């Protein structure tokens, strides 16, 4: 059975007081102050134990306003968790519902996958690095979240080609891309949402794209941020004179 928010809350209540204080301060001083006010999101970030997904050497920073390192992937690129405030802002924008099916690209530690899975019907989460995906599976098992399918693949173009006919209510990338990969928005159901961080450092923007009809889409820029680029992300073509 999928772990419920109530069960997770009971689980985290057993943590020692200093950790609980750090978690409270994370929510009140980092997340709320970044205009994340949705009570469901705030409760979720309190209930899903972030520290269970943080590497042992960074446990003291589990609730800090930083992108916690996860080590290097097979190509030597540094991987990291999203900062807590960015996790909250993205969740608030997506407004995930319990009947929804989600595609998540960039599993990482599995924590953001866990947040999504605690709200949704099912999450398909893609990670290009096999070691990270394996660790994410262990982390998710620690908190009894099992409505997740983990896939080791290059997810820059969305779902694997052998699932090309599957559409999602929500698609979210937790890494950046200089430009939107072709064909990803077409993997949404009508009414579905795609959230990506687009651009090159230091000028990146979180964009929310909604499919409003079979061929129509609406795009809104939510906020400015900066994230490491996903491997094999499409580059902006530059004109040569």
Which residue ranges define each predicted feature?
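Class I SAM-dependent transferase core
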Residues: 2-103, 111, 115, 119, ...
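Catalytic, metal-anchored helix/loop core of enzyme active sites in primary metabolism
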Residues: 241
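Conserved nucleotide-cofactor-binding alpha/beta core module
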Residues: 91-217
């Amino acid at each position: 059975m999928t772990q419920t928010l109530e069960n997770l809350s009971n689980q985290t209540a057993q943590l020692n007081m200093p950790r609980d204080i750090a978690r409270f301060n994370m929510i009140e001083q980092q997340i709320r102050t970044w205009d994340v006010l949705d009570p469901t999101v705030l409760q979720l970030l309190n209930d899903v134990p972030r520290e269970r997904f943080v590497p042992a050497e960074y446990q003291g920073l589990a609730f800090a306003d930083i992108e916690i390192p996860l080590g290097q992937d097979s190509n030597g690129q540094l991987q990291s968790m999203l900062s807590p405030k960015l996790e909250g802002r993205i969740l608030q924008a997506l407004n995930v519902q319990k009947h929804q099916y989600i595609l998540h690209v960039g599993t990482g530690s599995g924590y953001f996958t866990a947040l999504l899975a605690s709200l949704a019907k099912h999450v398909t989460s893609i990670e290009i690095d096999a070691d990270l995906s394996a660790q994410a599976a262990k982390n998710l098992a620690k908190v009894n979240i099992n409505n997740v399918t983990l896939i080791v693949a290059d997810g820059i173009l969305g779902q694997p080609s052998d699932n090309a006919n599957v559409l999602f209510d929500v698609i979210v990338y937790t890494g950046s891309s200089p430009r939107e990969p072709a064909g990803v928005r077409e993997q949404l159901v009508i009414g579905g949402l795609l959230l990506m961080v687009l651009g090159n450092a230091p000028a990146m923007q979180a964009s929310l794209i909604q499919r409003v009809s079979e061929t129509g889409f609406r795009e809104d820029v939510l906020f400015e941020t900066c994230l490491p680029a996903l491997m094999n992300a499409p580059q902006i073509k530059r004109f040569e004179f």
